[in-house]
Amino acid sequence: MKLCVALDLASRDENLAIARALKGLDIWLKVGLRSYLRDGANFLNELKKIDDFKIFVDLKIYDIPNTMADAAEVISNIGADMINLHASSGLRAMSEVMNRLANLREKPLVLAVSALTSFSDDEFYEVYNQNIDEAVLKMSQNAKNAGLDGMVCSVFESLAIKKECGTDFITLTPGIRPFKGNSDDQKRVANIVMAKQNLSDFIVVGRPIYKSFNPRETVEKILQEIL
């Protein structure tokens, strides 16, 4: 299991300060929509100059198939090590993205986003007219058939996805709260023990790290727990 630290702070300088504080640790960094729009593609280069971090660019690409493929190609060529697409875009769109990326010299890992962890069961049903478990398995099958590397999902769907798509099909699980505390705007949250039990390959942690008194110490503690 790998730790992916979410860089979701209010400014570029704050995000870079956290990255510098975590230099030398075996982690990935996640650059989300706010940071990418504000700080641009060069922000990835700045992060890699600090410590050659592996970077997950979390933009949840969702558009018509050709536009998705264009966007995925651009992001892949600026140094992303992992990107994601909305599984709701469907099999054809995801397949087109993977066909476009097939000839890249350095292709990133490509994951599909299933049900956002901010959704409650009722909220998901209101939007998709399906329960989460059934919908996520169907999305996962489509992602696997399209040639993607795995899924972004909650811990609660990870094991079922592994059983359906194989243990080598990656699950990246946000909404991880390693210590007791506020779940903030997440509904389907979990801890590290649950992530291990459900065979998560990556866990995403943000606020519990950068809101702590000593972020490096907090990350070191999390890394000990995921061994």
Curated annotation (Swiss-Prot):
<comment type="similarity">
    <text>Belongs to the OMP decarboxylase family. Type 1 subfamily.</text>
</comment>
<dbReference type="Pfam" id="PF00215">
    <property type="entry name" value="OMPdecase"/>
</dbReference>
<feature type="binding site">
    <location>
        <position position="117"/>
    </location>
    <ligand>
        <name>substrate</name>
    </ligand>
</feature>
<dbReference type="InterPro" id="IPR013785">
    <property type="entry name" value="Aldolase_TIM"/>
</dbReference>
<feature type="binding site">
    <location>
        <begin position="58"/>
        <end position="67"/>
    </location>
    <ligand>
        <name>substrate</name>
    </ligand>
</feature>
<dbReference type="InterPro" id="IPR001754">
    <property type="entry name" value="OMPdeCOase_dom"/>
</dbReference>
<feature type="binding site">
    <location>
        <position position="8"/>
    </location>
    <ligand>
        <name>substrate</name>
    </ligand>
</feature>
<dbReference type="InterPro" id="IPR047596">
    <property type="entry name" value="OMPdecase_bac"/>
</dbReference>
<feature type="active site" description="Proton donor">
    <location>
        <position position="60"/>
    </location>
</feature>
<feature type="binding site">
    <location>
        <position position="206"/>
    </location>
    <ligand>
        <name>substrate</name>
    </ligand>
</feature>
<dbReference type="GO" id="GO:0044205">
    <property type="term" value="P:'de novo' UMP biosynthetic process"/>
</dbReference>
<dbReference type="GO" id="GO:0005829">
    <property type="term" value="C:cytosol"/>
</dbReference>
<keyword id="KW-0665">Pyrimidine biosynthesis</keyword>
<feature type="binding site">
    <location>
        <position position="186"/>
    </location>
    <ligand>
        <name>substrate</name>
    </ligand>
</feature>
<comment type="subunit">
    <text>Homodimer.</text>
</comment>
<dbReference type="GO" id="GO:0006207">
    <property type="term" value="P:'de novo' pyrimidine nucleobase biosynthetic process"/>
</dbReference>
<comment type="pathway">
    <text>Pyrimidine metabolism; UMP biosynthesis via de novo pathway; UMP from orotate: step 2/2.</text>
</comment>
<dbReference type="GO" id="GO:0004590">
    <property type="term" value="F:orotidine-5'-phosphate decarboxylase activity"/>
</dbReference>
<dbReference type="InterPro" id="IPR018089">
    <property type="entry name" value="OMPdecase_AS"/>
</dbReference>
<keyword id="KW-0210">Decarboxylase</keyword>
<comment type="function">
    <text>Catalyzes the decarboxylation of orotidine 5'-monophosphate (OMP) to uridine 5'-monophosphate (UMP).</text>
</comment>
<keyword id="KW-0456">Lyase</keyword>
<dbReference type="InterPro" id="IPR014732">
    <property type="entry name" value="OMPdecase"/>
</dbReference>
<feature type="binding site">
    <location>
        <position position="30"/>
    </location>
    <ligand>
        <name>substrate</name>
    </ligand>
</feature>
<protein>
    <recommendedName>
        <fullName>Orotidine 5'-phosphate decarboxylase</fullName>
        <ecNumber>4.1.1.23</ecNumber>
    </recommendedName>
</protein>
<dbReference type="InterPro" id="IPR011060">
    <property type="entry name" value="RibuloseP-bd_barrel"/>
</dbReference>
<feature type="binding site">
    <location>
        <position position="207"/>
    </location>
    <ligand>
        <name>substrate</name>
    </ligand>
</feature>
<feature type="binding site">
    <location>
        <position position="177"/>
    </location>
    <ligand>
        <name>substrate</name>
    </ligand>
</feature>
